[in-house]
Swiss-Prot record:
GO terms for molecular function: GTP binding; kinase activity. Pathway: Cofactor biosynthesis; coenzyme A biosynthesis. Catalyzes the GTP-dependent phosphorylation of the 3'-hydroxyl group of dephosphocoenzyme A to form coenzyme A (CoA). Keywords: Coenzyme A biosynthesis, GTP-binding, Kinase, Nucleotide-binding, Transferase. The lineage of its organism: Archaea, Thermoproteota, Thermoprotei, Thermoproteales, Thermoproteaceae. It comes from the Archaea. This is GTP-dependent dephospho-CoA kinase. It catalyses: 3'-dephospho-CoA + GTP = GDP + CoA + H(+). Pfam families: DUF359 (PF04019). Transmembrane segments: none annotated.
Length: 140
């Protein structure tokens, strides 16, 4: 997490969004409060996030694995403004792409890799690639 703090500081991050239960819990554990977060409250590691009350608004959405539903997309649109926890019934992983596309400049999107790694992407550096990726995704 020290690396994430260093990245955020050197990048001048103004907002940090987290996707995933373990990632979000680790941010809280290390004193980094995300601007908004998306969780599904299901993890292989049995993590329970107690600090979710810091978010002003809870949005519950349905989102199947491998998709970003319109409902989930709308929730991310609200979440990038801040103070939102998105509770996903289904799978939240793909929402990291929506956060990268919709987040304002000087934002970081952090999500977990299934093998246990933490990925923290400065959106200004990756937004162009994510926008191209959306050209290949099917609209559902």
């Amino acid at each position: 997490m020290e690396v994430v703090k260093d990245i955020a500081e050197s990048y001048g991050a103004e907002r940090i969004y987290t996707v995933g239960d373990v990632v979000t819990q680790n941010f809280f554990k290390h004193g980094l409060i995300p601007t908004s977060a998306a969780v599904d409250e299901k993890t292989r590691r049995g993590v329970r996030i107690e600090q979710l009350a810091v978010f002003k608004r809870v949005i519950k959405v349905n989102n199947p694995p491998g998709y970003i539903t319109e409902e989930a997309w709308s929730a991310v649109e609200e979440a990038v403004r801040g103070g939102v926890i998105i509770k996903v019934e289904g799978e939240e992983d793909m929402l990291s792409l929506a956060f990268i596309k919709l987040a304002p400049p000087k934002s970081i999107v952090a999500y977990g890799h299934y093998l246990g790694a933490l990925i923290a992407l400065p959106v200004d550096w990756y937004k162009e690639y994510v926008l191209k990726l959306f050209d290949y995704l099917e609209k559902c």
